[in-house]
């Protein structure tokens, strides 16, 4: 089957005419709807791009705010740690000072107690010695001494004893 040139040109004209008629019909009846769909889709894409840009900007702002909050929290934590160290040091120094004061107070009290015990012991020894001196004097003199003589004798003996 061979197609002649005339048939080929006829087919060409028929197909071209059909395409032109089809395009005219599409333009008359469907082109508005197609153009409306394409316009709507274009607007939707434009809105989606704008929303994506706004979301990106919002995310950047949120990230910056979160970073600022994190930095502030780190700074506050560092300050709290620093303050706690300082308070600990002050309390330690205070405890050491209190312990030192308590040790000094106890030492002074011990020294006072020692002095008091020494004084009590010396007083007891003096009393004992005065009694022994009176007994000795009575035996030596063979008689009881009156109070004044006894007192003078005791004082003189104690003075001699204190110097020794």
Curated annotation (Swiss-Prot):
Subcellular location: Cell membrane
Keyword Ligase appears in the UniProt entry: no
Entry protein name: ATP synthase subunit b
Predominant location category: membrane
Record keywords: ATP synthesis, Cell membrane, CF(0), Hydrogen ion transport, Ion transport, Membrane, Transmembrane, Transmembrane helix, Transport
HAMAP family: ATP_synth_b_bprime
CDD domains with a match to the protein in the record: ATP-synt_Fo_b (cd06503)
Any Pfam family matching the protein: ATP-synt_B
Claim: Transport is one of the keywords in the record: yes
GO MF annotation list: proton-transporting ATP synthase activity, rotational mechanism; proton-transporting ATPase activity, rotational mechanism
Protein's job: F(1)F(0) ATP synthase produces ATP from ADP in the presence of a proton or sodium gradient. F-type ATPases consist of two structural domains, F(1) containing the extramembraneous catalytic core and F(0) containing the membrane proton channel, linked together by a central stalk and a peripheral stalk. During catalysis, ATP synthesis in the catalytic domain of F(1) is coupled via a rotary mechanism of the central stalk subunits to proton translocation.
Family designation: Belongs to the ATPase B chain family.
This protein's GO CC annotations: plasma membrane; proton-transporting ATP synthase complex
Listed transmembrane segments: 6-26
Membrane topology summary: Single-pass membrane protein
Subunit structure comment from the entry: F-type ATPases have 2 components, F(1) - the catalytic core - and F(0) - the membrane proton channel. F(1) has five subunits: alpha(3), beta(3), gamma(1), delta(1), epsilon(1). F(0) has three main subunits: a(1), b(2) and c(10-14). The alpha and beta chains form an alternating ring which encloses part of the gamma chain. F(1) is attached to F(0) by a central stalk formed by the gamma and epsilon chains, while a peripheral stalk is formed by the delta and b chains.
InterPro entries noted in UniProt: ATP_synth_B-like_membr_sf (IPR028987), ATP_synth_b/b'su_bac/chlpt (IPR002146), ATP_synth_F0_bsu_bac (IPR005864), ATP_synthase_B_chain (IPR050059)
């Amino acid at each position: 089957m061979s197609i002649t040139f005339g048939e080929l040109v006829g087919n060409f004209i028929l197909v071209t005419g059909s395409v032109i008629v089809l395009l005219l019909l599409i333009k008359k009846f469907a082109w508005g709807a197609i153009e409306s769909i394409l316009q709507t889709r274009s607007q939707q894409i434009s809105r989606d791009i704008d929303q994506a840009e706004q979301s990106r900007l919002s995310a950047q702002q949120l990230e910056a705010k979160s970073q600022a909050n994190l930095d502030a929290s780190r700074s506050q934590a560092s300050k709290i740690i620093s303050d706690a160290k300082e308070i600990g040091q002050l309390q330690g120094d205070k405890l050491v000072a209190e312990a030192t004061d308590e040790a000094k107070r106890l030492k002074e009290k011990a020294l006072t107690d020692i002095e008091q015990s020494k004084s009590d012991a010396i007083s007891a020894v003096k009393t004992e010695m005065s009694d022994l001196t009176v007994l000795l004097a009575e035996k030596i003199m063979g008689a009881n001494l009156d109070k004044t003589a006894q007192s003078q004798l005791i004082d003189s003996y104690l003075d001699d004893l204190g110097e020794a």
